[in-house]
UniProtKB/Swiss-Prot annotation:
Coiled coil: none
Protein encoded by which gene: Cd74
Record keywords, A-Z: Adaptive immunity, Cell membrane, Chaperone, Disulfide bond, Endoplasmic reticulum, Endosome, Glycoprotein, Golgi apparatus, Immunity, Lysosome, Membrane, Phosphoprotein, Proteoglycan, Secreted, Signal-anchor, Transmembrane, Transmembrane helix
Record function comment: Plays a critical role in MHC class II antigen processing by stabilizing peptide-free class II alpha/beta heterodimers in a complex soon after their synthesis and directing transport of the complex from the endoplasmic reticulum to compartments where peptide loading of class II takes place. Enhance also the stimulation of T-cell responses through interaction with CD44.
Annotated Thyroglobulin type-1 domain residues: 194-255
Protein's UniProt name: H-2 class II histocompatibility antigen gamma chain
Residue ranges of the TM segments: 31-56
Compartment(s) of residence: Cell membrane; Endoplasmic reticulum membrane; Golgi apparatus, trans-Golgi network; Endosome
Keyword Cell membrane among UniProt keywords: yes
InterPro entries registered for this protein in UniProt: CD74_antigen, MHC-II_Gamma/Thyroglobulin, MHC_II-assoc_invar/CLIP_MHC-bd, MHC_II-assoc_invar_chain, MHC_II-assoc_invariant_trimer, MHCII_invariant_trimer_sf, Thyroglobulin_1, Thyroglobulin_1_sf
Membrane topology: Single-pass type II membrane protein
The organism's taxonomic lineage, starting at the top: Eukaryota, Metazoa, Chordata, Craniata, Vertebrata
Length: 280
């Protein structure tokens, strides 16, 4: 009986010992799992931190590049702007130099330059003041008027262009109303100034027997050949109407050739030959 009880008690204790032997194995598996998860989380955090660090460095470099680009643009615009006129320091000269007359030779040889034409106009000062606040808002317009308007429309935002377009409409209406109020005055042709030949012809009618009526060209100058219809004589004249000596006759004349002499009273220059040689 005692032996049976020992066997029963030993048989009942065997499952309990088997169950107690499995507990350390499950605890070991859980420890490995927790360790793996912890290492994975640590690696993820380290990767995120490294990525954030590199992004921060790249952002700093981008900010520096942006600031450098803006500074270069401002420097370029500043170089293109007209320079303000420098104040002229008062001249310090001794009294003998003030009393000495200035030499006109150097002044006549050197071309006169307008030093206030560039960089000292009202438009330049206003442009210089406005470009300090917003240099990008004032582009350089070097094309024709339609091309400049198209460039402005593309460079300006929608609101600014609407404001500018509204201003142009108001300006156009103002110009149209101003032109409509202006009365068109009849254009008065200025009186035509008559030349000496035309004035002489105006005093003589077309048909007047016995009177000499000169002939004028389209510019109002005397024709080189003048003829008197009543007597039949013809002669050559200078452009001012003065008769050329020794050319009056009833024969044919050729006044188109250049004359060898000129009348001093004609105002055309000095005689080419001496008047005394002509009468010889």
């Amino acid at each position: 009986m005692d032996d049976q009880r020992d066997l029963i008690s030993n048989h009942e204790q065997l499952p309990i010992l088997g169950q107690r032997a499995r507990a350390p194995e499950s605890n070991c598996n859980r420890g490995v799992l927790y360790t793996s998860v912890s290492v994975l989380v640590a690696l993820l955090l380290a990767g995120q931190a490294t990525t954030a660090y590199f992004l921060y460095q790249q952002q700093g470099r981008l900010d520096k590049l942006t600031v450098t680009s803006q500074n270069l643009q401002l420097e370029n615009l500043r170089m293109k702007l007209p320079k303000s006129a420098k104040p002229v320091s008062p001249m310090r000269m001794a009294t003998p130099l003030l009393m000495r007359p200035l030499s006109m030779d150097n002044m006549l040889q050197a071309p006169v330059k307008n030093v206030t034409k560039y960089g000292n106009m009202t438009q330049d000062h206003v442009m210089h003041l406005l470009t300090k606040s917003g240099p990008v808002n004032y582009p350089q317009l070097k094309g024709s008027f339609p091309e400049n308007l198209k460039h402005l429309k593309n460079s300006m935002n929608g609101l600014d262009w609407k404001v500018f377009e509204s201003w142009m409409k108001q300006w156009l209406l103002f110009e149209m109303s101003k032109n409509s109020l202006e009365e068109k005055q009849p254009t008065q042709t200025p009186p035509k100034v008559l030349t000496k030949c035309q004035e002489e012809v105006s005093h003589i009618p077309d048909v007047h027997p016995g009177a000499f009526r000169p002939k004028c060209d389209e510019n109002g100058n005397y024709m080189p050949l003048q003829c008197h219809g009543s007597t039949g004589y013809c002669w050559c004249v200078f452009p001012n109407g003065t008769e050329v000596p020794h050319t009056k006759s009833r024969g044919r004349h050729n006044c188109s050739e250049p004359l060898d002499m000129e009348d001093p009273s004609s105002g055309l220059g000095v005689t080419k030959q001496d008047m005394g040689q002509m009468f010889l």
